[in-house]
Amino acid sequence: MELVFKHVNVEVDKKLILNNVSGLASPGELLAVMGPSGAGKSTLLNTIAGRIPLSSGTITVNGHSITKDLRRKLCYVLQQDIFFSSLTLRETLQFTAKIRLPDKMSNEQITSKVDEIIQDLDLTRCVDTIMGDVWMRGLSGGEKKRASIACELVTDPVMILLDEPTSGLDYSTAFSLIEMLRSYARDHNKTVVTTIHQPSSSIFYQFHKLLLISDGELAYFGDTGKVVDFFHKADVSMDSHYNPADFILEKLKEDEKTRLKIVSAMDQMRNSSNWPVKLRSSEDLLDDEIQPETAPPADIMMEQPYNEKDSVRVSLIELDKTDDNTQDQKWPTGFITQYTQLTLRGFKTSKSQIFSKFKLIETVTLTIIVSLIWFQLPRTEETLRDRMGLLFYMGMHLGFTPLFDTVIAFPLERMVITKERLAGWYRLSAYYLAKMTSELVLILIQPLIFITIIYWCVGLNGVSSYYATLGTLCLHSLAGQSVGLFLGIVSMDIRKGMTQATIYIMVTMLLGGFYTRSLPVWLDWMKHLSFQWYTFSALLYLEFYDGPDLRCAVRTAVSESQFSTCLDSNSTSIPSSEVLQFYSINYPYWTYILPLFAFIFIFRIAGYFILKFKQKPNQAK
Ligand SMILES: Nc1ncnc2c1ncn2[C@@H]1O[C@H](COP(=O)(O)OP(=O)(O)OP(=O)(O)O)[C@@H](O)[C@H]1O
Ligand SMILES: [Mg+2]
C-alpha cells in the first residue's frame, strides 16, 4: 500500500515537534527516516502508527485516510525488544500468531504461517532458545530484533514501521537485517518505513527513499541516491571519500546557517515541478484524488518510473477485503481465544518463576528449618507461645512471599502488556482474568507442600483442622498476592513498589495479633486492615476449637499458670476452648474468612480499574 503523509504538524505540550513534514512510501520499497537525535523521527513514526495525534496535515494509505481497522493492518516494531524472557522464540511466535490471527484459521494454518516467517527471517537456528534478558542468556541482539519483526509479520501487515531496528547491532548484523527487510518488502510487496541512526554507506544505499528531518522540519525527501546531489545544489558539498549518511547528518548539525541552507533548498524543491504530485498542496490534490489510480506519476525525482499500478490495484482489493472483514470487529480474535492463549502463556511464564531453582531452595530450606524447630511440639501451656509463633509464622511466610514476588514481577510484565495492548492485541479484561487463572494453581502449590509437611511434623490439631488450615492459608496467599498486584500496579516501578510493600508488610505484621494482642483503643480498629490478623485469628480458631486439652504450666515459686482453670481447681489441663477465649477469638470461623475474600476481590478489582483508567498506556516511548 502506498503511504502518503502531507504537511504533517505535530504539537506536544505546545511545542511544535514536526513542522510541515511530507513524504511517501511505496509498496515494495524501503523508506529511511534519518535525522539528528531529537529531530522527530520517532514522533513521525508514532504519528503514522496513530499513537500520537496529528495537529494538522493528512496521512493516507492508497488515497484513503487511515482508519482504525487499517491501523491494525500496519505493524510497528518498537526500538526496544520487549518479551517475556522465559518463553522460547517458538512459544512467543505461536502465542502472537494465535492471538492476532483470526479465529477461523486452523492450527495447521497458523503453524505453517509461523514456520514460513521463521524461514523468511532466518530464525530457524534459534526457535527453541528462550528470549532471555539481562539476567538470563537467550537470543542475541540481532536475533531478538528479528524476533520482534517476526511477531509483527505474522499478521501479514500491509505496512511495516520500524524504529531504529539496527541500533545496538554490529555492522554485518545490521546490514543483513536491512537486506532481509529489503527482500521481504520486494517479495511480498510491502511498504517499509524505518528510522535509522548512522548507517554505513552500504546500508544507506539499501534504502530506496530517504526522508531527512532536522529540528522537526523536512530537510530532504526523495531518492536515496540523489541526496548528495541535492546537497551539492544547496551549496553544501561532500568530499568524495565520505560516507553520505555521516556527511548529511554532520552538515545538519554543523551550524544553523548550513541547516537553514538545506531546509530552504528543500522548500524550493517542494515548490518545483520535481516534487511528487501526490505531495503537492491540497488544491492540487483535489483533482488528483478524483482518480487516484490513474493519476500520472509525474515525478522526475523518483529514480524508477512509477509503474506499480497493478500492485496498487491489488492492494486496493485487499483494502476492500479488510474493510468487509473487520469493519466492526475491534479485536483480531474473540474473548475466549484471547483468554485461553493468555492463560496458557501466563501458565508458562509463572511456571518458570514459581518452579525456579531459587524458589525450590527457599521452600525446602524453610520447610526443613520450621519442621526442626517446632518438631512434635508438646501440647502444654509452656509451649503455647511457640504454637502461636508457628501459626503466625506460617501466615507471614505464605502471605508476604507472594506479595513480594508479585510486586517485583509485575512492572516487568507490564512492559510487555503495554506494548501488546498499544498494538491492540487483546482486551485488558481477557489478560487480567487470564492472569488470575494461570497464577491460581501455581500460587497454591507452595502452601500445599509447606503446610502438609509442617502440619504433621509439628503435630497440630487434627485431620479436619489440617484441611481447613490449608484452605485458609491458600486464601491468605491469594490475599497477599492481590495486595502485591495492587501495589505493583499503583507503583509501576520495582523500587517504589518494594518500599510500599515493606511499609505495608511491617504494619500488617505489627497489627497481625502476635506481637501484641492489646492495642490502644484508638489504634485497635487498624487491625482490621491487616489480612494477617484475620488469618492468624482463623488459624488460632482451627488449632484450638475442639482440640485436645493443654497441660497446665508447672507451678513454681516465680511463675504460675495464666489460666483460671489451672489456678482454681485441681485440674491439670486447660480445655482448648479456654485458650480461644483467652485470646478473644470469640466469633465463628467464617467471620475471619470472609474478610480474606474481601481482600482478594477488592484489591484485584481496584487493580484492574487503575490499570484500565489511570495508568493508561499513552505513548510507546
Ligand atoms: N511528550 C513530549 N513532550 C515534550 N517534548 C517531547 C515529547 N515527546 C518528544 N518530545 C521532543 O520531541 C523531539 C523529537 O523527539 P523524537 O523522539 O521524535 O526524536 P528522535 O528523532 O526519534 O530522536 P532519537 O534519534 O534520539 O530517537 C525531542 O526534542 C523531544 O524532546
Ligand atoms: Mg527516536
Regions inferred by a protein language model and the residue ranges of each:
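Conserved catalytic motifs of ABC-family nucleotide-binding domains
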Residues: 68, 81-91, 104-105
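Hydrophobic alpha-helical transmembrane segments of multi-pass membrane transport proteins
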Residues: 372, 386-457
